[in-house]
Amino acid sequence: MLDVSCLYIIMCKKFRYLIVLKRFIIIWILLVGVLEVRAQYDPSYSHYFDMEPSFNPAAVGKQSKLNVTAAYALDMAGFEHNPRTFQVAADMPFFLFNHRHGVGLSLQNDQIGLFTHQRLALQYALQNKLLGGTLSVGVQGGMLSEKFDGSKVDLGESSDPAFSTSDVNGSGMDLSLGLYYQHKAWYVGLSAQHLTSPTINLGETNELKIDATYYLTGGYNIRLRNPFLTIKPSVLVTTDGTTWRGDLTGRLVYQYEKRMLYGGVT
């Protein structure tokens, strides 16, 4: 039969093992996620069909009016440091030298764990008539800002200089290109984000590698007998050359004069 002192020693050893295991898990996460990140960098939205300029600069100015969008995404609600994304953007068309152009501006703030990704981008597109539709060629230039909140990392008594326990940040330039073809009833777009694959240094020992990401999108408008109803299927495929994601959406849209209501599933 164990006495109280032996039981206390056993419990202390188990507690110590739990602390060591916790530190090991934290260090492993930092090794995978802080030293060099090679995952898809951009956030995804279920309403991608209304936010095409966020991944294809050639889509700016495709509407005949000023277009302003704002989106907020919250994942894993209730968990500490859960992913949160906010984006606001605006674009509009204009005419110059007998050509239609598009210009846009977007601001994004994306928080994932102890990382904060920010992007400020300016977009431009040139539109030309082609085969009964409109072909748009777009370019986007911007600034990426990265921050890691190391002050919230608990490594216990460890003093390993590879793991920052203070706030570190860095920035870099970013370049994206896109093509967008729009016909009467359908459209297709192809774009590449982060073409320069920038590497952003976070302090003296860590870096964030951002791989180029490619997007293919398309959609079709199916008119029904009711002139106010339209079925709009659409698709978005995203890949960085290693992993990929596909979104398939179907919407039923009711539109009468300036009023619009839709429902769908992705």
State the predicted function of each range.
Residues 40-266:
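Subset of outer-membrane beta-barrel
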Residues 1-44, 50, 250:
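Bacterial Sec-dependent N-terminal signal peptides
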